[in-house]
């Protein structure tokens, strides 16, 4: 992708479409540090470094990749761990401080509540929140990736091929969930397809 300039307004849902191999994923992949890129991103009036996943996420930008097994899921971890891990590591959510913050422990109750909320809202078909992500269907894995992004409470959310490889009922549910999240949180969503 070369010479692309986008101005996206808060709360907007924007679609980027094109043929396979045309580079449409270069935008979120560059911002999130998944592919080397050059240029500049100004987000909420602040210049952010490209090629830096941590800085993007700290500044409220998340990305749900179509490559859920490559960059989206921790396949050998539970659903609750998948949903809350990034928020725990980057935002220090789902953590209980002790001794004035000298010691920190996972807040298993808060993790369970968050996971159960998204399992219910996104109709993730599973035994419970402790089921391993690898044992879910592709559609349910995609829903876990979406829940993981929602748990980060992003202000800008990139979503690549959100309905690829999932059944028709789940497609509607995923698109409705994105719309609902946008409306309830005034989150800017960019859908790449």
Where are these regions (language model features)?
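Glycine-rich phosphate-binding loops of nucleotide-dependent enzymes
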Residues: 1-193
């Amino acid at each position: 992708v070369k010479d692309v300039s986008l101005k996206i307004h808060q709360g907007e849902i924007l679609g980027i479409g094109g043929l396979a191999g045309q580079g449409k994923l270069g935008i979120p992949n560059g911002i999130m540090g998944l592919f080397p890129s050059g240029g500049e991103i100004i987000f909420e009036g602040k210049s952010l470094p490209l090629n830096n996943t941590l800085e993007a996420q700290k500044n409220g930008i998340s990305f749900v990749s179509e490559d859920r097994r490559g960059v989206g899921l921790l396949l050998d971890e539970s659903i609750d761990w998948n949903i809350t891990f990034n928020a725990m590591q980057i935002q220090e959510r789902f953590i209980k401080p002790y001794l004035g913050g000298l010691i920190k422990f996972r807040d298993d109750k808060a993790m369970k509540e968050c996971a159960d909320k998204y399992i219910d809202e996104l109709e993730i078909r599973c035994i419970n929140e402790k089921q391993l992500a690898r044992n879910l269907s592709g559609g349910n894995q995609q829903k876990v990736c979406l829940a993981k992004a929602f748990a980060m409470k992003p202000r800008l959310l990139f979503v690549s091929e959100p309905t690829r490889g999932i059944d028709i009922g789940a497609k509607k549910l995923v698109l409705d969930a994105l719309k609902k999240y946008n409306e309830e949180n005034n989150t800017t969503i960019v859908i790449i397809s």
